[in-house]
């Protein structure tokens, strides 16, 4: 199948109630997830705008850093990186800070032969000069996706394939769009975290936290763009709207979250993150994988009738 000139990979649950579609040449983004024919993801400006300009949509992978960096340079151990000019390489936020890692159109995944109609796997080698100038740590990523009649599970494994250890700072940015006509103000939200990261004026964590309260609430006219820590076990984030509830569970490997719900938009994002925003600079919460080692993550998006 093709979408905006991109080939897609479609998987279908055994019972036929859930489908998911991925775009290998646009960073393996899951651009569509349906339940009984109803779309659960916000399409944003479409796949081409995502691939070429980093306009996030669907369920995008943010790699090699999730959300923002406080400047255009960082150091990990003895490796010091000065990022090149952003054009065609990575995006900038309104403050001119690097955001969301490499532009998706630069990340083209090799899809593995399918073993069943309800799953797919793909690999990305991070070893070319254009990628290493952003993140000079040779590694491989693997995505394994599976759909059941309750939803989607997505497993991401980073393996350090070079001679150097690899810092892990990726995340995902799922744009959940509850089906039906329930007004945004009536949505009920629950957050599986106990702490909010204190941010500075440029949305960079200061290193301080404050209690998160309440953890369950009606969204109303609230606006969210907040980093969270102190995740529950298991970390579950949910939105109830109309007749269905969408629940994200961070199954493995994600210790931080970002919640994004801008006013006037019919989506909410519960973002699983391996490290907090700016971890490549601050070092806070940063996992480093030794040569030959790996870091595995998993999250699930489930849909249920109320």
What are these regions (language model features)?
Residues 161-163, 180, 305:
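Short, acidic/polar linear motifs in exposed loop/turn regions
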Residues 1-89, 233-254, 293-304:
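Beta-strand-rich N-terminal accessory domains
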Residues 165-167, 174-251:
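Active-site/ligand-binding surface loops and adjacent short beta/alpha elements
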Residues 11-13, 20-24, 126-174:
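Acidic, contiguous internal or C-terminal segments within carbohydrate-active enzymes
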Residues 240-306:
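Active-site pocket scaffolds in enzymes
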Residues 39-56, 82-108, 184-211, 267:
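Glycine-rich, pocket-lining loop/helix-strand segments that form or immediately flank
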Residues 75-80, 112-121, 146-151, 180-184, ...:
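A short, structured loop/turn motif at beta-sheet edges
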Residues 1-4, 86-149:
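Extended, loop-rich substrate-binding clefts of extracytoplasmic carbohydrate-active enzymes
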């Amino acid at each position: 199948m093709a979408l905006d000139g991109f080939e897609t990979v479609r998987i279908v649950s055994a019972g036929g109630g859930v489908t998911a579609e991925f775009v290998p040449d646009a960073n393996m983004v899951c651009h569509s997830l349906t339940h009984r024919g109803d779309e659960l993801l916000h399409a944003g400006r479409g796949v081409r705008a995502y691939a070429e300009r980093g306009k996030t949509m669907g369920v995008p992978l943010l790699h090699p850093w999730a959300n923002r960096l406080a400047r255009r340079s960082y150091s990990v151990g003895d490796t010091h990186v000065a990022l090149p000019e952003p054009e065609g390489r990575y995006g900038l936020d309104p403050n001119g800070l690097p955001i969301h890692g490499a532009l998706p159109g630069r990340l083209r995944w090799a899809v593995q032969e399918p073993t069943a109609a309800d799953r797919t796997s793909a690999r990305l080698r991070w070893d070319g000069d254009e990628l290493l100038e952003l993140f000079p740590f040779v590694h491989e990523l693997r995505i394994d996706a599976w759909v059941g009649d309750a939803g989607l599970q997505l497993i991401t494994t980073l393996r350090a394939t070079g001679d150097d250890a690899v810092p892990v700072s990726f995340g995902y940015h799922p744009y959940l769009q509850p089906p039906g006509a329930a007004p945004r103000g009536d949505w009920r939200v629950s957050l599986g975290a106990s702490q909010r990261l204190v941010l500075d004026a440029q949305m960079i964590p200061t290193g301080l936290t404050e209690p998160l309260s309440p953890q369950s609430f009606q969204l109303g006219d609230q606006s969210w763009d907040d980093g969270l820590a102190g995740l529950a076990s298991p970390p579950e984030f949910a939105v109830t709207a109309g007749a269905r509830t969408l629940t994200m569970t961070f199954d493995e490997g994600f210790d931080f979250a970002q919640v994004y719900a801008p006013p006037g938009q019919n989506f909410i994002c519960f973002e699983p993150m391996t490290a907090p925003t700016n971890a490549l600079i601050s070092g806070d919460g940063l996992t480093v994988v030794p040569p030959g080692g790996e870091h595995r993550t998993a999250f699930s998006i489930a849909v249920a009738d109320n």
